[in-house]
């Protein structure tokens, strides 16, 4: 069984039951309520999805995200564009809406600018492409009004801790959180999803390897080495009397994050870290970023680093590290790289020519030496004959 730390499945089922009783989504027009429910039904079954996306039903995480953002957009379209039917929107209307949202003309309830406009754009684009496919099946043609929508966006800020700060933070934690923090930093595991699904049986007998199972991973299963926290883990398991099928860590993610935030603020204040986020906003997931920064200069190959973190694309490396903590490690020995293959081949060719010349010279000398020895031998024989004759 896979642990669902945020209860996405329960939340989805509870919401569906509520809507079935009401018949519509509250505070939405009937047209928008019906089209959103139809879209969600297809996504729950994996029907009418993009040919480029993965096949099958969408996860409960995805379903909850679609539901939340589409209902939000529906209400905003009604308030700002005065439309009760999203399927009748024009290209100019949606482009104007999302530009205003990105530029802060359309504000949040607290008066601040939306930081994740691209997330709403992506949701709407996916919805519209679904609507185009459904209409096409019905023999109708729907124009793609999302072509010019900007789905780019600013990368979310996060909390960066360097190695010294990690050590200070780790030493200030209680035993339970000390183990969690070092485990997060060592493995770079996704928290809380992958983290809370780790069992004692996923650790090797010497606590130096971790198996992140396929069914608990967002991308793919992997077996990685524990280079920092193995001894700490061993003591933690022994002290808590954990058995093989026990989950390694049991805690409430929100409680854990509150603990980390309070401790970070106490140790480092409320200023901004190098990655832009305040220290007081530290969460478990920030240690995945910090872990990437730590391992990036230590891994010899990019593919090995991607494997450790469960990534398929190389751009994730920069996304998570932003090259923080990197340093210039070039040395004089590395200058050998500047010697081209051709130059090396030329040098090798010259060495081979010299070797052949030396071999020829040695062969000539051996021939000459043999001839000299032959003359010496003959001369010695003559001397012996002369001596015998004189006697």
Regions found by a protein language model. Give the residues of each.
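N-terminal core-binding DNA-recognition domain of tyrosine recombinases/integrases
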Residues: 37-156, 188
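Long, amphipathic, Lys/Arg-enriched alpha-helical "connector/arm" segment
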Residues: 103, 108, 149-176, 198, ...
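Short, charged phosphate-coordinating catalytic segments
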Residues: 134-136, 184-207, 303-304
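Basic, Lys/Arg- and aromatic-enriched nucleic-acid-binding interface segment
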Residues: 163-192, 288
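Conserved tyrosine-mediated DNA breakage-rejoining catalytic core shared by Y-recombinases
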Residues: 197-235
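Short, polar N-cap/turn motifs at the start of nucleic acid-interacting alpha helices
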Residues: 204-205, 280-281, 300-321
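Catalytic-site neighborhood detector that most strongly recognizes the C-terminal catalytic loop/helix
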Residues: 216-218, 309-346
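Active-site/catalytic core of tyrosine-dependent DNA strand-transfer enzymes
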Residues: 227-279
């Amino acid at each position: 069984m896979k642990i669902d730390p945020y209860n996405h499945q329960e939340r989805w089922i509870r919401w569906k039951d509520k809507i079935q009783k009401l018949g519509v989504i509250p505070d939405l027009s009937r047209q928008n309520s019906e089209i959103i429910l139809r879209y969600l039904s297809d996504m729950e079954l994996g029907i009418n999805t993009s040919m480029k996306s993965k096949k099958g039903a969408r996860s409960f995480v995805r379903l909850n995200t679609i539901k939340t953002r589409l209902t939000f957009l529906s209400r905003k379209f009604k308030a700002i564009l005065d439309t009760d039917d999203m399927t009748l929107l024009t290209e100019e209307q949606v482009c104007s809406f999302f530009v205003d949202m990105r530029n802060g003309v359309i504000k949040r309830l607290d008066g601040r600018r939306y930081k994740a406009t691209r997330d709403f754009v992506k949701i709407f684009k996916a919805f519209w492409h679904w609507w185009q496919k459904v209409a096409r099946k019905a023999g109708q043609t729907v124009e793609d009004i999302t072509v010019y929508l900007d789905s780019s966006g600013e990368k979310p800020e996060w909390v960066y801790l360097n190695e010294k700060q990690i050590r200070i933070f780790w030493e200030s934690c209680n035993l339970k959180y000390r183990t969690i923090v070092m485990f997060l930093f060592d493995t770079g595991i996704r928290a809380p999803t992958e983290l809370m699904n780790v069992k004692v049986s996923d650790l090797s007998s010497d606590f130096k390897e971790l198996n992140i199972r396929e069914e608990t991973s967002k991308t793919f299963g992997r077996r990685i080495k524990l280079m920092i926290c193995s001894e700490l883990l061993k003591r933690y398991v022994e002290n808590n009397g954990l058995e093989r099928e026990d989950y390694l860590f049991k805690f409430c993610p929100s409680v854990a994050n509150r603990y980390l935030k309070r401790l970070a603020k106490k140790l480092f204040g409320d200023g901004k870290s190098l990655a832009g986020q305040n220290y007081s906003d530290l969460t478990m997931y920030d240690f995945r970023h910090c872990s990437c920064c730590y391992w990036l200069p230590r891994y010899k190959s990019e593919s090995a680093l991607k494997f450790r973190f469960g990534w398929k694309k190389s751009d994730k490396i920069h996304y998570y590290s932003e090259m923080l903590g990197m340093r210039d490690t070039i040395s004089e020995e590395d200058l050998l790289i500047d010697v081209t293959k051709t130059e090396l081949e030329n040098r090798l060719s010259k060495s081979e020519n010299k070797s052949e010349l030396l071999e020829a010279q040695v062969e000539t000398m051996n021939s000459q030496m043999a001839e000299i020895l032959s003359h010496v031998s003959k001369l010695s024989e003559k001397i012996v004959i002369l001596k015998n004759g004189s006697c």
